């Protein structure tokens, strides 16, 4: 299930975001969390409250889903190519079978290790499995397959009051959250992101 975070301030992005998803993605269940539900959004919606703690609201929204796995998304994650469904299912099976992993990021972003995940040429550890996270890029708001409960646990532990990526290092280390990222020598775009 896609799990998209958005805000009504970003409504100018909805048409291209949902349009590109429809064009390039297989039919995957989709829930959007938003500060105020909108008829412009063509899928299930859960309302969060701007004036409440961001992490608590986010984790509450996740708890409303039945699925055990979600694909973390935001309204500016535009698809430019068809989703590799077989690869997505392969990565989901890896998450299901490996208790040491909590997520697989579907893009190379940030400062990450170059240590390969055994038996997979396109998967690398965000941080080597025998090391603690030391960089804020260990958590990245990028397209990511998450074990839903681990994402809930992380947001509860981090407990940020506002939207953002800071403050996740200590909670990730405390909870033992480890993950992988996908990379197949895609072209670099900007300072830290790659095509994927």
PLM regions with names:
Residues 1-69:
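N-terminal anchoring/stem segment of glycosyltransferases
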Residues 118-136:
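Short, flexible, basic/aromatic active-site loop/helix in glycosyltransferases
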Residues 32-34, 70-72, 102-107, 145, ...:
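A structural signal for short, well-ordered beta-strand segments and their strand-loop junctions
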Residues 82-112:
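Conserved donor-nucleotide/metal-binding helix-loop-beta segment in metal-dependent transferases, i.e.
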Residues 14-19, 55-59, 84-93, 162-171:
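Well-ordered, non-membrane alpha-helical segments in soluble/globular domains
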Residues 135-196:
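Catalytic core and acceptor-binding pocket of nucleotide-sugar-dependent glycosyltransferases
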Residues 68-80:
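Short beta-strand-to-loop acidic/aromatic patch adjacent to the donor-nucleotide binding site
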């Amino acid at each position: 299930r896609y799990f998209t975070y958005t805000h009504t301030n970003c409504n100018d992005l909805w048409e291209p975001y949902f349009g590109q998803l429809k064009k390039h993605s297989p039919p995957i269940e989709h829930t959007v969390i938003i500060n105020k539900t909108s008829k412009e959004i063509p899928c299930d919606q859960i309302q969060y409250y701007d004036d409440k703690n961001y992490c608590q609201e986010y984790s509450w929204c996740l708890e409303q889903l039945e699925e055990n796995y979600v694909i973390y998304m935001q309204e500016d994650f535009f698809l430019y190519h068809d989703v590799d469904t077989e690869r997505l299912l392969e990565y989901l099976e890896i998450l299901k079978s490996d208790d040491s992993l909590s997520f697989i990021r579907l893009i190379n972003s940030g400062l990450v290790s170059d240590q390969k995940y055994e038996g997979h040429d396109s998967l690398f550890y965000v941080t080597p499995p025998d090391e603690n996270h030391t960089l804020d890029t260990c958590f990245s708001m990028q397209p990511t397959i998450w074990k839903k409960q681990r994402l809930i646990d992380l947001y509860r532990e981090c407990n940020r009051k506002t939207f953002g990526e800071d403050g996740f290092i200590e909670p990730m280390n405390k909870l033992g959250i480890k993950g992988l990222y996908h990379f197949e020598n895609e072209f670099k775009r900007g300072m830290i992101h790659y095509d994927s």
